[in-house]
Amino acid sequence: MAGCKTMLSSLELGKLQREQHAHDMRNHFDIVSLHKTERLKHYGLHFAKYVGRLARESAEAKPVERTIVDTLLVGLSTANTLHQDLSNENISSPSRLKQIDPLRIFADAAGRFADACEKIDHLEEFLPIARQANHDILCWVITAADERKFDLQSAIRARRSELASRHFYIED
């Protein structure tokens, strides 16, 4: 996979991935408790939801930046479920970035991820497709954040804190 400039190094992504596991164990145990194939389908639905948010543009109440951060968080959780070690991957812009509409890159990858999830039910090979689609989604996230010039790591910390506050009854 070709490389390009990114806002996050593979080591930083690996650290975020490990932190996401701890976050998920604390705040999303209902999802972590699902069978891995059901978890992947759940994440596929999230990706589809986020493509829809972005497609609605100004008709969507949630800001684009929040959707980008949410997509990254789900991508990290997805990588954990797929045993996809992001610290060993070159997360960069996909070559298809030259398309007129960059949303198509995300939609394409989300569609391929859905295809992988469907293959689970047919007992067909799905892991390589799911891993590549998740990789491409993460590339899209990095590029989208870079284009908007916002700090993903700070945004991730803020979003995780917001999500954790919903579980006021958990003592750390």
Language-model region placement:
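Flexible "arm" and connector segments at domain edges
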Residues: 1-172
